[in-house]
């Protein structure tokens, strides 16, 4: 109920010419190798660390992103790391650039909106490590977020206890609108097909469905009723 087409289409135009113009305007000049330079004269390089688990094809997504950034002179180096190392580096706020599939904007929006609202320090919520630490510690640690992020958090607090469904949906849309407008995270692919392999004689499995953490994968499709048809 929180989806708006404008959220999905925000900043999706592929326009390398405009991207180059904006980077030039920022003063990020290109060096002799074609890559852009930082203000100190060194090459601008970004380390993209991610956990290539089975939930989404992060490797393929990363390849495309690296290619697009390279085309405008930004050097991005992808690196696959383990889940445990990712957690350690996230907690220490050492990850420059990360990647994770975004969900929890459905049934779990009011309880686990980790990719849209700073809640705490989590290895999946790479976009708001120090803001999450600030909220979780009551302002004793981390970095105090800007007013817009405080408003996002405030809307979520109201959303959690909203008894009126229309008000809850309105608040949820305000949160997602802030993300779409401010690009707290950079979206890549939305609603991509997710094939599921099913053995020929397994029955009661739906041909089509929704796949995501919000639905606990196929839990909502009553897997307890699946059965193998005997010959």
Which ranges hold each PLM region?
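Detector for C-terminal structural segments
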Residues: 1-5, 17-20, 56-66, 86-231
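Immediate post-signal peptide segment of exported/extracytoplasmic ligand-binding proteins
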Residues: 13-47
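Short, well-ordered beta-strand elements
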Residues: 43-53, 76-78
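A mature extracytoplasmic/lumenal domain signature
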Residues: 50-52, 80-82, 190-192
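Short glycine-rich hinge loops at helix-strand junctions in the catalytic core
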Residues: 73
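Short helix-initiation/N-cap motifs at beta->coil->alpha
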Residues: 78-88
């Amino acid at each position: 109920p929180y989806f708006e087409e404008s959220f999905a289409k925000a900043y999706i135009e592929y326009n390398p010419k405009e991207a180059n113009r904006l980077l030039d305007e920022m003063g990020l000049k290109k060096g002799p190798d074609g890559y852009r330079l930082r203000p100190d004269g060194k090459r601008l390089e970004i380390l993209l660390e991610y956990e290539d688990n089975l939930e989404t094809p992060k490797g393929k997504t990363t390849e495309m992103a690296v290619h697009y950034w390279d085309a405008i002179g930004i050097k991005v180096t992808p690196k696959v790391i383990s889940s445990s190392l990712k957690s350690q580096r996230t907690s220490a706020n050492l990850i420059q650039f990360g990647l994770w599939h975004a969900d929890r904007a459905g049934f779990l929006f009011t309880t686990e909106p980790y990719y849209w609202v700073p809640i705490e320090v989590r290895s999946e919520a790479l976009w708001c490590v120090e803001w999450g630490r600030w909220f979780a510690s009551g302002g004793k640690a981390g970095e105090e977020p800007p007013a817009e992020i405080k408003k996002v958090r405030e809307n979520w607090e109201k959303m959690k206890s909203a008894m009126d469904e229309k008000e809850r949906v309105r608040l949820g849309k305000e949160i997602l609108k802030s993300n779409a407008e401010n690009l707290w995270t950079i979206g890549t692919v939305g609603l991509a097909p997710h094939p599921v392999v099913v053995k020929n004689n397994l029955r009661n499995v739906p041909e089509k469905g929704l796949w995501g953490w919000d639905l606990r994968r196929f839990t909502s499709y009553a897997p307890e009723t699946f059965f193998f048809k005997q010959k």
